[in-house]
């Protein structure tokens, strides 16, 4: 019997574009900062926390001396015990609330870079060393403010969670000083790119699922996974942000209350009885958009979108999906399963063959092995040359090398990277369409005395996994 915990109250939702593949101008016009569900909420039972919470005018009213934080050096793939507590002295002093410091004494405010229902985001520069940060200003009076600060403290230290550097408290608001992700938002990149190659999508998606899995292990449900809340660093790596709707959850508990963004919300949220698997559904919607360029569930109104989420059957066999590999479609089908108990977990997503095949580790292994072959071939040729010829060749080789002191973006190696991604995608689709008879399949999948080395599947646990996946 699962214990049920109600969410705070029906939260704000954002209106998202239905089609990510149309022109940039029309796509931009589809965005609105926030789309309120207050009218819709009146038709629903207004939910409140079952836990007794004192007045939220200041963090000083809460239990002093205790806060939450992750275990030091915890791996995202190793269970952490869900929500370990530590003394507040173990948390960075600058991120503790109730300090007397004034933000104007430490930072200079710059331009506004974002605005939402609960506050605004501005660039701020450190007076001490000139480093730029993002400052999120949140008005007091909403419990989401206190919860967001606590959860960011709880999750701090993970490389894919936006780092909280300092918290300043004033009479009417909190200032959260966080790392500045200069690469912008993932949604803006999606609008420009349209459809992503499977290789590129898989590497973005794996990083996202790693941080979602970490949140779930730490007893946190984000409840608002969408590309607007995924930021990019200068190197193109993702950072999960905006924990305003996030909730703490114990193992076996369920949540209630509407929260999230309409196009990404899981069907069980509409029934107001859900668990951390709502994040898996939302991530599945994002993966669908990355691979197809459009959102799966659309409508002219909230009710129409919700009706599509509850009833529309997704077709992964026609249109753009004919050029997408079967493993990718299989993963999507498992993530966008309406039956929550049948939906895979974040950890299972990370172990799916499609993720294992396309991630950096697998592809780097392919490159290293091919490089070793080419180096072996060139060394054989050098052995047959005179010492003078070897010296000339080595000098010429050194002169050809270009210094790589300029910063590179893993998502901006443009044509060459995209060409390689396209080749891999074509090969995967071709392999997926191969039909192997059962006798041949048993011979291919069964171990032999002289197994063939599979350079492209070093991340897979067995050859049988490869046969089932492709």
Swiss-Prot record:
Superkingdom in the source lineage: Eukaryota
Region (Disordered): 377-419, 441-464
Pfam family, one: Pkinase
Composition bias type Polar residues, residue spans: 377-386, 445-464
Coiled-coil parts of chain: none
Residues the entry annotates as binding ATP: 113-121, 136
Active site: 224
EC number: 2.7.11.-
Keywords, comma-separated and alphabetical: ATP-binding, Kinase, Nucleotide-binding, Serine/threonine-protein kinase, Transferase
EC main group: transferase
Reaction(s) the record says it catalyses: L-seryl-[protein] + ATP = O-phospho-L-seryl-[protein] + ADP + H(+); L-threonyl-[protein] + ATP = O-phospho-L-threonyl-[protein] + ADP + H(+)
Compositionally biased tracts (Basic and acidic residues): 387-403
Signal peptide span: none
An annotated Gene Ontology molecular function: protein serine kinase activity
Annotated Protein kinase domain residues: 107-355
Family listed: Belongs to the protein kinase superfamily. Ser/Thr protein kinase family.
PANTHER family according to UniProt: SERINE/THREONINE-PROTEIN KINASE (PTHR24349)
Protein name: Serine/threonine-protein kinase PEPKR2
Gene, per the UniProt record: PEPKR2
